[in-house]
Amino acid sequence: MTEKPISLSDYQQKVDDWIKEYGVRYFSELTNTAILMEEVGELARLMARKYGDQSFKKGENEASQLADEMADVLWVLTCLANQTGVNLEEAVKANFEKKTTRDASRHKNNPKL
């Protein structure tokens, strides 16, 4: 049986429930911002090794790391959204509309693309 995809709102709630049950409380917003930067750095390191010019170090294994690092970034970003009262589902919809309006022909008319 396959699980039903999870909405951003449901994900935000699941993260909040997990924090309250297992994490005791959220770290401060500043601490979570620093943790987010750390997680983005880990993702960047993996991207540089997998798609860039760096090679993996002896003993490093890239299998499934990319998805895990992206999920770590999403987790901490969701914690910050929960802490600051941002509804990610609404924010993503509004951001998509903004980009569509602003960039309706911008990329199509870009000779570099």
Please place each PLM-identified region on the residue numbering.
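Flexible "arm" and connector segments at domain edges
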Residues: 1-70, 74-113
